[in-house]
C-alpha cells in the first residue's frame, strides 16, 4: 500500500515539474487605456490577432 502511495506521489511530482518547465512568460495585459504584450514570440496568426485588440475604455469619459 505504501509503495502505491510513493509511486503516485513521485509521478505527480514529476508531472508537475515537467508542466512548470514548459510554461512561457507571455503576458497580454488589456486595461482601459492600453494593450501591452510582454515576453511573447509573435508569429503571423498571433500578430494579426494582436493588431485587432483594443483597450476596453468602459469607464472613459473621452468621446
From Swiss-Prot:
<dbReference type="Pfam" id="PF02495">
    <property type="entry name" value="TGBp3"/>
</dbReference>
<comment type="similarity">
    <text>Belongs to the Tymovirales TGBp3 protein family.</text>
</comment>
<keyword id="KW-0812">Transmembrane</keyword>
<comment type="function">
    <text>Plays a role in viral cell-to-cell propagation, by facilitating genome transport to neighboring plant cells through plasmosdesmata. May induce the formation of granular vesicles derived from the Endoplasmic reticulum, which align on actin filaments.</text>
</comment>
<protein>
    <recommendedName>
        <fullName>Movement protein TGBp3</fullName>
    </recommendedName>
</protein>
<keyword id="KW-1043">Host membrane</keyword>
<keyword id="KW-0472">Membrane</keyword>
<feature type="transmembrane region" description="Helical">
    <location>
        <begin position="1"/>
        <end position="21"/>
    </location>
</feature>
<keyword id="KW-0916">Viral movement protein</keyword>
<dbReference type="GO" id="GO:0016020">
    <property type="term" value="C:membrane"/>
</dbReference>
<dbReference type="GO" id="GO:0046740">
    <property type="term" value="P:transport of virus in host, cell to cell"/>
</dbReference>
<dbReference type="GO" id="GO:0044167">
    <property type="term" value="C:host cell endoplasmic reticulum membrane"/>
</dbReference>
<feature type="topological domain" description="Cytoplasmic">
    <location>
        <begin position="22"/>
        <end position="63"/>
    </location>
</feature>
<keyword id="KW-1133">Transmembrane helix</keyword>
<keyword id="KW-0813">Transport</keyword>
<keyword id="KW-1038">Host endoplasmic reticulum</keyword>
<dbReference type="InterPro" id="IPR003411">
    <property type="entry name" value="TGBp3"/>
</dbReference>
Amino acid at each position: 500500500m505504501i509503495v502505491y502511495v510513493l509511486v503516485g506521489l513521485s509521478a505527480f511530482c514529476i508531472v508537475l515539474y515537467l508542466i512548470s518547465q514548459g510554461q512561457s512568460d507571455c503576458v497580454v495585459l488589456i486595461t482601459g487605456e492600453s494593450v501591452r504584450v510582454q515576453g511573447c514570440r509573435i508569429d503571423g496568426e498571433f500578430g494579426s490577432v494582436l493588431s485587432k485588440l483594443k483597450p476596453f475604455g468602459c469607464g472613459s469619459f473621452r468621446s
